[in-house]
Amino acid sequence: LDLKWFRVPRDVVFGAGTLEYLKQVQGSKAFICMGKNSMRANGVLDKVTGYLKESNIDYTIFDGVEGDPSVETVYRGAEKMKEFAPDLILGLGGCSAIDAAKAMWVFYEYPDKRFEDIKAPFSIPPLRNKARFVAIPSTSGTGTEVTCVAVITEQGGIKHPLASYEITPDIAILDPEICLSMPPNVTADTGVDALSHSLEAYVSTMANDYTDTLALESIKTIFEWLPKAFRDGSDITARTKMHIAQNYAGMSFSNAILGIDHSLSHKISTINTTHGRCNTILMPAVIQYNSKVAGQRYAQIAKYLGLPGSSNEALVSSLVAAIKNLNTSLGIPASLKELGMDENSFLENAETYAKAALEDPCTGTNPRKPSVEDLIQVYKAAYYGYDVVI
């Protein structure tokens, strides 16, 4: 039995002004989980609460979720959920707020569970006994509004991706107007994060016809429209294209899963940068490493983008160059060293990072099976900005 699947939310609502769809969502008590201030500052929170009031839905707000949501924040939010007893959970804002809300949801429905109990992939028990989940993203990056993943940071700064189709939201509301206030650096970092999702999904060992179609279109759209959204954040067409492209990427990787680009990025705990920026700096080295077994797949991506090359090897080189050029156009450094990561700290910890990355859930679907030494070499190539030759 060659069993494959494609699982996404029941409802994906998209287009300018679709935040108003909240008025059609059924419920009596809504728990709104959000970040620190941006949703208040841009007026989105007022719109959300206004629509809930029109529907006679009571609500409470849990705010202050940090950029890399911690286990402690998740536990604190889960306690607030238990006190309020909602039947709707709204993840509002960037991926951190939505990911944190997903994890809180688990502990709200299963108060006796601890983080260690749900770290293994697909170990979360059935949800929706107490509440349904609505995701409203304000950035065009992770696609978490349609994915089975929530990235939570443990002590020591190590990011751990929780993975279960139970935490795939029930409703995703994609309103590009919410993204108009995103500053250029956030637009860039979230956009290249989405690109890393599509690139990894396409070469994953679990890729299929559904995920391939979404990944390719996402990659092409991001290359065309991310620079435009970066240059002019008020361009609603560019914002719409990017919001849909990152959503395609999310649906693709939620079903095909990811690879070592994410495994390596998850484990660098001493670097002060965004997840998306780290992903895209690592990506050229990852592609070069994986191309020894997945060269044809990367070549197909390059052809879809119209890049030059008469052989798989040449097409892979064109793809790597295109990613580097995109990064440069977005003001993203070419290496981890250029990013400012301390060299002594990196060299001291590279083996520790590599060992942790080897055990990351994303490594299991990488097209090339790595060793710890392989991953160290990929880290070093990304740190110094040289080519991978192994």
Give residue spans per PLM region.
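Fold-independent oxyanion-binding glycine-rich loops
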Residues: 10, 16-17, 34-36, 65, ...
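Glycine/threonine-rich beta-strand-loop-alpha-helix active-site module
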Residues: 72-177
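Carboxylate- and glycine-rich phosphate/diphosphate-binding segment that chelates Mg2+/Mn2+
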Residues: 149-256
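C-terminal charged capping/lid subdomain of soluble metabolic enzymes
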Residues: 302, 308-390
